[in-house]
Amino acid sequence: MDGYVSHYTNKLDAKGRVSIPAPFRAVLVRDGFDGLYVHPSIDQEALDCGGHALLREIDGLLSGLSPYSEERDLFSTALIGTSEILKVDSEGRTILTETLKSYAGITGEVTFVGHGHKFQIWEPGRFRAHLEEARNRVRDLRRQLSARHAAPDAPPLRSHGARE
């Protein structure tokens, strides 16, 4: 996989800088993005981050919506209007703004979590709780998939909290 994989926890230094994990920096470099694109996650109290691949995904989503539609305006506001482009120094560090830290509840440490085309930045305790919930939900979904394979005419899967 050429994307962001695994998770890492790093501390903010006395100047508020945090080191982006080397494997994540390598993906940003391959992507050709100079800096770090960051916006508050729509679904979690975390930050969505990446480079050109993330921006292309957002552009693709927006281009599928009618210009001047309420839906497009809402997505644009949430994904572009609240975003920031952060600088990354020569040692691979960046400084999260107070707005971003406040949204994600970040104080002294952050956990970087790979999602393939993007990564997220979490407050470590919030990430542990999210990971536990995700594992529980995946176990439930796996059981549903197993049951579905046993009964191929079953209705489509619907995960807890799924949107229409």
Swiss-Prot record:
Region Disordered, annotated ranges: 144-164
UniProt subcellular location: Cytoplasm, Nucleoid
Domain SpoVT-AbrB: 7-60, 83-126
Chief location bin: cytoplasm
Biological process (GO), any one: negative regulation of DNA-templated transcription initiation
GO terms for MF: DNA-binding transcription factor activity; transcription cis-regulatory region binding
Electron transport among keywords: no
GO cellular component terms, A-Z: cytoplasm; nucleoid
InterPro entries xrefs: MraZ, MraZ_C, MraZ_dom, MraZ_N, MraZ_sf, SpoVT-AbrB_dom, SpoVT-AbrB_sf
This protein's record includes keyword Repeat: yes
Keywords carried by this UniProt record: Cytoplasm, DNA-binding, Repeat, Transcription, Transcription regulation
Similarity-based family: Belongs to the MraZ family.
UniProt subunit comment: Forms oligomers.
Name of the protein described by the UniProt record: Transcriptional regulator MraZ
